């Protein structure tokens, strides 16, 4: 069992999702309002991915906003990044060094992804 598993498990429980032990290196949670949240462990990094399908008419504006808001000078405390999957799926993500991972940092990263998603989708 990795030392960060209890942190990830507690985070999932805080979101109302029970977990089993041992945790998979890829956890996928369906969020009612914000799409799919994935937590992926790879090497010494934990990446949080927030993916949401958009209507075709939202895609261009969302892509421009996401890239603008995640530019290095505007990314804030955590290095948030944006990407696109397929024809209509906005993907926002942040990679965290496992050595500095704490439960508050995990919550902060998730909250920043949610805020960024709201900003990107705002009219």
Swiss-Prot record:
It is found in: Cytoplasm; Cell inner membrane. It holds the Pfam family Type_III_SycN. It is a peripheral membrane protein. One of its GO terms (cellular component) is cytoplasm. CDD domains: T3SC_IA_SycN-like (cd17031). Keywords: Cell inner membrane, Cell membrane, Chaperone, Cytoplasm, Membrane, Plasmid. One of its GO terms (biological process) is protein secretion. Disulfide bonds: none annotated. Its main location: cytoplasm. InterPro entries: T3SS_SynN. Changing residue 77 to T: In plasmid pYVa127/90. Interacts with YscB to form a complex which specifically binds to YopN. Functions as a specific chaperone for YopN. It could facilitate the secretion and the subsequent translocation of YopN. NCBIfam families: type_III_SycN. This is Chaperone protein SycN. It comes from Yersinia enterocolitica.
């Amino acid at each position: 069992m990795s030392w960060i598993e209890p942190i990830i498990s507690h985070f999932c429980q805080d979101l109302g999702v029970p977990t089993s032990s041992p945790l998979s290196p890829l956890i996928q949670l369906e969020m009612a309002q914000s799409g799919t949240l994935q937590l992926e462990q790879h090497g010494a990094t934990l990446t949080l991915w927030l993916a949401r399908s958009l209507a075709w008419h939202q895609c261009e504006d969302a892509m421009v906003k996401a890239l603008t808001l995640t530019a290095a000078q505007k990314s804030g405390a955590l290095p948030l990044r944006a990407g696109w999957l397929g024809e209509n799926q906005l993907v926002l993500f942040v990679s965290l060094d496992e050595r500095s991972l704490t439960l508050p940092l995990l919550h902060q990263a998730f909250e920043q992804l949610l805020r960024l998603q709201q900003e990107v989708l705002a009219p």
